[in-house]
Every structure is written in C-alpha cells, then in structure tokens.
A protein has these predicted regions:
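Alpha-crystallin/small heat shock protein
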Residues: 1-110
Length: 110
C-alpha cells in the first residue's frame, strides 16, 4: 500500500490513547498536512519547494510527496500532532461513552 512510504508505527500509549508515528525526514511542518475526512485520518506530505532548484550528484534520501490514510474507529478523535527529529507524531484519543442510567417510573394500570 502506497509503496510503504513513509514508514510508520502505531502504538497504544494508554487504555484510551494511541500514537501514529511517521518517518518524515526532509519534510518541514509547512510541507505536511493532517486532515480527517469521513472517519479517515489523512496525512499528506508535499515535496519541499527548494527541491526543484537543487542539483543532486547522488540522491539517497527520499523526499517525494505522499499520502497515507488510516481508518479511525468509531469514537476515536485526533488529540494533537507534533513533529520532531524527522518524526511526525499524531496522537489519537478514544472517548469512552458515559454510562447513562435512567430510572423508569412504573405507573398503575389505566
């Protein structure tokens, strides 16, 4: 799927939270976007603007544009995201539905 780029991990950080980490070396914060569309988390990376102006004698570090999609389960929301040391971390939180107890009054027959 999508040639495996960029590589990513999904880890559970608590009973109700998860973290998706993508290896996005070479991409700045302005080159990345995160959206949620119809329960799909979509991470996109655009090639940095100065890529076209550079003449590479050897090109071993990939910085091509990408799109990665993750299906979010019901009740899972994006809690935040940050980028550091070439890794993009997307934190997810699963909301635990509150248990609502309703007492039904029993009336006498009509």
């Amino acid at each position: 799927d999508q040639n495996g780029y960029p590589p990513y991990n999904i880890e559970q950080t608590s009973d109700t939270s998860f973290r998706i980490t993508l290896a996005v070396a070479g991409f700045g914060e302005d080159d990345l976007s995160i959206t949620v569309e119809d329960r799909q988390l979509i991470v996109r990376g655009q090639s940095p603007a100065d890529e076209e102006e550079r003449l590479f004698l050897h090109r071993g570090i990939a910085a091509r544009q990408f799109q990665r999609s993750f299906v979010l389960a019901e009740g899972v929301e994006v809690a935040g995201a940050n980028s550091e040391n070439g890794l993009l971390h997307v934190d997810l939180k699963r909301s635990v539905p509150e248990k609502i107890v309703t007492t039904i009054k029993i009336g006498k027959g009509a």
